[in-house]
């Protein structure tokens, strides 16, 4: 984007890592058919059935920059998921993975037009999959100059992409 991002992190984004697990349900067990979301001792845990007979369990949040899953994260996710869905202890463990989600200093996403031809929509942290459709719709409307459309106006001023910027984009 005209060199604005070269060698810099002007938006103050940080990687928030999350461990996630995959299990395989044995054929003799009835698989769960709905997403299960819960809190165990103030920790969020979710169990997601997949069409291939596997289950995804997630996810932790950490900012330690380790590349792989943490033993503590794997242990905590398994323990919490089994407390919520006890039959999981009979599943086959397939893998533990880690991914990075972009976070902002105040954990609010960046969503806004910063100049003609440049709309920023990022920093959704652990809610990215939930807010992706909203971010895409509003981002497209901002880029096309049609926001707000259909009489639906949501105040997105708190999501100003430049609120933490270390540099100003060229105008």
Language-model regions: role of each:
Residues 1-116:
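Active-site substrate-recognition segment that forms the wall
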Residues 87-171:
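C-terminal catalytic lobe of FAD-dependent flavoproteins
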């Amino acid at each position: 984007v005209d060199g604005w991002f070269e060698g810099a992190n002007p938006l103050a984004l940080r990687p928030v890592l999350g461990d996630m697990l995959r299990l395989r349900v044995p054929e003799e067990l009835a698989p769960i058919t709905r997403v299960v979301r819960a809190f165990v001792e103030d920790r969020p845990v979710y169990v997601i059935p997949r069409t291939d007979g596997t289950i995804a369990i997630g996810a932790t949040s950490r900012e330690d920059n380790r590349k792989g899953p943490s033993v503590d994260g794997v242990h905590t996710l398994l323990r919490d998921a089994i407390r919520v869905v006890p039959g999981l202890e009979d599943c086959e463990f397939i893998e533990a993975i880690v991914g990075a989600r972009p976070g902002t200093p105040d954990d609010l996403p960046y969503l806004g037009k910063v100049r003609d031809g440049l709309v920023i929509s990022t920093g959704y942290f652990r809610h990215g999959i939930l807010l992706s459709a909203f971010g895409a719709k509003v981002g497209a409307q901002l880029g096309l100059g049609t926001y707000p459309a259909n009489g639906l106006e949501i105040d997105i001023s708190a999501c100003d992409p430049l609120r933490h910027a270390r540099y100003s984009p060229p105008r």
